[in-house]
Every structure is written in C-alpha cells, then in structure tokens.
Amino acid sequence: MTDYRLQPTMNLWTTDDNASMMEAFMSSSDISTLWPPASTTTTTATTETTPTPAMEIPAQAGFNQETLQQRLQALIEGTHEGWTYAIFWQPSYDFSGASVLGWGDGYYKGEEDKANPRRRSSSPPFSTPADQEYRKKVLRELNSLISGGVAPSDDAVDEEVTDTEWFFLVSMTQSFACGAGLAGKAFATGNAVWVSGSDQLSGSGCERAKQGGVFGMHTIACIPSANGVVEVGSTEPIRQSSDLINKVRILFNFDGGAGDLSGLNWNLDPDQGENDPSMWINDPIGTPGSNEPGNGAPSSSSQLFSKSIQFENGSSSTITENPNLDPTPSPVHSQTQNPKFNNTFSRELNFSTSSSTLVKPRSGEILNFGDEGKRSSGNPDPSSYSGQTQFENKRKRSMVLNEDKVLSFGDKTAGESDHSDLEASVVKEVAVEKRPKKRGRKPANGREEPLNHVEAERQRREKLNQRFYALRAVVPNVSKMDKASLLGDAIAYINELKSKVVKTESEKLQIKNQLEEVKLELAGRKASASGGDMSSSCSSIKPVGMEIEVKIIGWDAMIRVESSKRNHPAARLMSALMDLELEVNHASMSVVNDLMIQQATVKMGFRIYTQEQLRASLISKIG
C-alpha cells in the first residue's frame, strides 16, 4: 500500500497557483454533461479568506487516517467478491450549516482479471489517445502539487490511466447533500443502497452512478455506518451481501466499544502489522474545546484506553482512543475567535500529510487523499501549535518495505500537547523497531529490493529445473528419471544426431558424383549419334507429322496427340500441361511402329481456354 499525503492545511483547489485543478478533473470529454455543477447538490470548494465556521465534524474516538486505510483495505481484500475500490464518505458541514458527505479516504484495488482487456462502455469513448494524454497531464499536475511543487518526470505517469482509475480519482471532487445521490440516500435513510447492473446504474437517478456505468462499473453499493458511508464498486455484477453490510457497520463504527476490531479477520499481508510503525500505536485525537476551562473534559492521559487489532498472523497493535469524545456534529466552532488560526485549520478540500512521491496508482495500492488533520480548537494560542510543530519536526518518519514490495510511510501528528509523554514513548518504540538493512545481492533491473542468498538460490534452482524439464521433453529415449541419467541420454542422443549428419553429408556427395557421371555419359551419346550418317537415316525413315485434336466440355478438355515416338513426346506433353496449369484426370499412350498416340483428359483451373487457344498453346510447347 502506498500512502500519499500533504500538509493538513494545504488546499489544492483554492490556491491561486492551482485554481485550475478542479477544472482539470471536471473538464474532460463529456464530464460536464454527466456531473451537474457542484452548487446544485453539494459544496466542494471555497475561496473565502475570512473566518468561517468549522466545516468538519469533530473527529470521533478511534477515527484516524491510518486505521481508516486499513479498514478499507481489509473490507475489500477480505471478501471473495471482486471489488475494485472502496471509499469512505465522511460527514461534514457546508458554510450554511447543512450536513454533507465528502471524501474521507479511499483504497483502489483494481480489476481482478488483468489478462482480459479493460471493460469499456459503448458510450462516448473515454480512452482515446487525446483523453489519455489529458488524464496523464492532470495526474502529473496532481503529482507535482502533492510532492510539494516538484514536477515529476514524464516516466512517472507512463502507463494508461484506466477508466476505473480515472473514476476513482474524480471521486475526490465529489460530495453529497443529505438524501442526494446513492451515498446521501444511504446516509439519510440508514439503509444500504445496492445497485447492480449497467441498466440499474443508468436508471438510478444518480449522476455519479451513471458516470460509473460509463466508466465500466457494474456494481456500486453505499452502506451507511455510525460515522459515515462506505461505498464499494466493482466492474462485475455482484448481488447484495448481508455479510458485507454487517462487516461494514462493525468495521466502521468508531463510537465506544462497538468499534472493537479484535474479532474481525483482516485479510492483509502478515508482515504488515509488524513492519508498519503506524499500526503499533496511534496518537490521541483532540476534540473541540477539550482544553478550555469549565467544559468538564478531563485532560489526564489516564482517561485514554486502547483497543487491540488482531491480524491473521497473531500480531496485535493498539489504537489509543478517548472514550469521552463527543461524536455529535457541531457546526459552530470556537476557532472563529482567532482569524489566523481559522485560516490555517479551516477545512475546505484538503489532502492528508505525506512527503512521499506520488505516481500513478496501481492495483492493490491505497490512494490516500483523506483529511487527517488532527486539530485542537480549544486553545487559540498559536504558541502551543508552534511548540507542537517543533516537537513533530524532531520525530522520525518510518519507511518500511513490505514483503509484497509495497512502500508504506507512517507519519503521525499529535493533536494535544498534554500527551507529549505518550508521543515520546511512541517515537522511542518506532526507533527501536526499525528494520535493519538487508545484506544480499544487488537489485536487478526493475526490482525494488535486493534478493537475499536464500531467495536467489531458490530462483536459480527453479530455473535449472525448468531447463531440465525442457531437455527431458526433447530427448526421445530416457533410461532413468534422475538428472545424471537424463544428461547422459541427452549426450548420447546428440552424438547419434551428429553421426547421422555426417552419414547424410557423405550420401549427398556420392549422389552428386553419380549425377555428374550420368551427365557426361549422356553428352557422349548425343555426340556419337550426331556424328553418324544423317542423310541415310533421314532417307530411310519417313517423318511422321504431329496432329493435335482438342475438345472442350465445360471445365474439362479432351486432348489427342499423334506424333513420332522420338524425343519423348509424352514427357513434353506432360510438361506443357503443367505449364498451362491444367489438372490431368486421365492419360493414356500407345505406340504403333514409329507412331505414338496420346490421349489425356484435363480440367481447367484458374485459366480458361477456348478450343483454339488450347490447341495453339499445345502446338507451341510440344512442336
């Protein structure tokens, strides 16, 4: 899983330099016709710089970016259905105080069957070369924004951006009012909305569902939970599953003890729980007004409790959570007392923190653009945040390379200065558990991690066995099945082939010499025959003229030739028929004294002759 994050206060859609980013997502071919303007349903961006009410619902206990990513991944990786992506829609508020659902986080797995071509719709083509260049351009601009202004090379986005990947990326710009769209209906009614089939998607009345059908989606399901709505989509038609609905409602319930994940089976990499420092312990999450005097919120770290997440390999990790946090949304926030603070931490359409370089998302990678800013709004004093920032700069980021060659970044930001002692212990634990650098062979081309000697030896033996299998297939007679006998039989077979080649070459040379001798003998006979008394032979023999009769019936022709038997007239007739591309069905020959009579029945093929044309052609070739 690859985790992409930005600074929590960076807004990609409202800065002056990046104001065209929203248009980049929404101005592709026919996108404007399939998604109505955002003002009709939801509010996704703002350009106001004055202090505004807080837009995000206060973070609930146990809700943070790391566990949300793991929950989304475990949801679709742990099922036998072929889900393509999973998105968590997080409730928040617009400037009017109305509740809306916005992008919380997402996980893109990709299509199950990579051997088959990508599913495409018969609607207007979204995968033309021009559209592909446009998608790559938008993705490169997004990469440069996320990587802090460093423009990535063109090789970073060299593959095609598939329709499902583009649909997943464009989903970051979506938001839903309560009761609008599939996610809004699921959040308003509390019931799952399951739409399967391209016809049902186009007739669902939701523009996003129609767009998903255009991009090859066949199933979109929105399942409400206590803290938001989980949307899963697939390129295959999948029937409604009550097990998946129950799993979502348990897995994404962050309130109190209902969110305990110890009994769930997370179908993840077994080493991921041990290698990823972000899974060992999570920082406590602050709530609005938790540090203000008189609000009755305890500040002692003893009021925190931890929940255990059980993985398949038996390793566990803890998530620190405050049970006294109030999950109730609060549209009016005390941050309005400080305009500078509000401008820094007000949520518009922000991305989460990361310093990693972004590339095109592949199958099985988490594309994290969720909002992970853990904020403490109760203390308007900027000095506390500057101190917190200095502490965070001293913390080490842990970068772990899992066994499946997926790069994972773990970076935590604290929400309260009261828990600095807890954070310090976390930093020490991360530093102690850092994996040592492996010593082994240098990585080959395209390999991210060098192989150790055990893996290299295993691959060498597999390659050697494959070659022995190929050798056994070409050797005809194998005495025994062991490798030594196989090599001996192969050597004997090769020597036998060599002897056959030598013998064949000698026979070829012998036949060539015999042919030369026959040619010399024929030349001598012709010379002796021509040196005789030609006048006496000509006077004694009466020349016989040549007569050719031809009859054509449809595609067949009957040929009768009367000529002298000298100079092989039968061979000349057959040669003429071959040159004229005539197929011989029947032929006969008889000799009376010096007269030879030939009869042949032939069939015309590609060339069609008349009776006169065929007779003239035969006379020119035989006579």
Curated annotation (Swiss-Prot):
GO molecular function: DNA binding; DNA-binding transcription factor activity; kinase binding; protein dimerization activity; sequence-specific DNA binding; transcription cis-regulatory region binding
Protein's recorded name: Transcription factor MYC2
PROSITE patterns: BHLH
GN (gene name): MYC2
General function of this protein: Transcriptional activator. Common transcription factor of light, abscisic acid (ABA), and jasmonic acid (JA) signaling pathways. With MYC3 and MYC4, controls additively subsets of JA-dependent responses. In cooperation with MYB2 is involved in the regulation of ABA-inducible genes under drought stress conditions. Can form complexes with all known glucosinolate-related MYBs to regulate glucosinolate biosynthesis. Binds to the MYC recognition site (5'-CACATG-3'), and to the G-box (5'-CACNTG-3') and Z-box (5'-ATACGTGT-3') of promoters.
Keyword Nucleus: yes
Extent of Low complexity compositional bias: 299-308
Phosphoserine PTM positions: S563
Motif Nuclear localization signal, chain ranges: 434-442
Amino acid composition bias (Polar residues), ranges on this chain: 309-358, 376-391
Region (JAZ-interaction domain): 93-160
A cellular-component GO term for this protein: nucleus
Provenance organism: Arabidopsis thaliana (Mouse-ear cress)
Record note on quaternary structure: Homotetramer. Tetramerization enhances DNA binding affinity. Interacts (via N-terminus) with RGA, (via TAD domain) with the mediator subunit MED25, with TIC, MYC3, AFPH2/NINJA and the JAZ repressors TIFY10A/JAZ1, TIFY10B/JAZ2, TIFY6B/JAZ3, TIFY6A/JAZ4, TIFY11A/JAZ5, TIFY11B/JAZ6, TIFY5A/JAZ8, TIFY7/JAZ9, TIFY9/JAZ10, TIFY3A/JAZ11 and TIFY3B/JAZ12. Interacts with JAZ13 (via jas motif). Interacts with MYB28, MYB29, MYB34, MYB51, MYB76, MYB122 and mybe MYB2. Interacts with PYL6 in the nucleus. Interaction with PYL6 is increased in the presence of abscisic acid. Interacts with KIN10.
SMART domains xrefs: HLH
Residues bearing the modification Phosphothreonine: T328
One BP term from GO: regulation of defense response to insect
Keywords, in A-Z order: Abscisic acid signaling pathway, Activator, DNA-binding, Host-virus interaction, Jasmonic acid signaling pathway, Nucleus, Phosphoprotein, Transcription, Transcription regulation
Domain bHLH: 448-497
Domains: entry comment: The transcriptional activation domain (TAD) (149-188) overlaps with the destruction element (DE) (154-165).
Subcellular localization: Nucleus
This protein's record includes keyword Transcription regulation: yes
Span list, region Disordered: 111-133, 265-399
Chief subcellular location: nucleus
Source species, domain of life: Eukaryota
Activity regulation behaviour: Down-regulated by KIN10 that controls its protein stability under a phosphorylation-dependent manner.
Description of the deletion phenotype: Minor effect on jasmonic acid response and no effect on glucosinolate biosynthesis, but decreased abscisic acid sensitivity. Myc2 and myc3 double mutant has an increased insensitivity to jasmonic acid. Myc2 and myc4 double mutant has an increased insensitivity to jasmonic acid. Myc2, myc3 and myc4 triple mutant has no jasmonate-related defense response, is devoid of glucosinolates and is extremely susceptible to generalist herbivores.
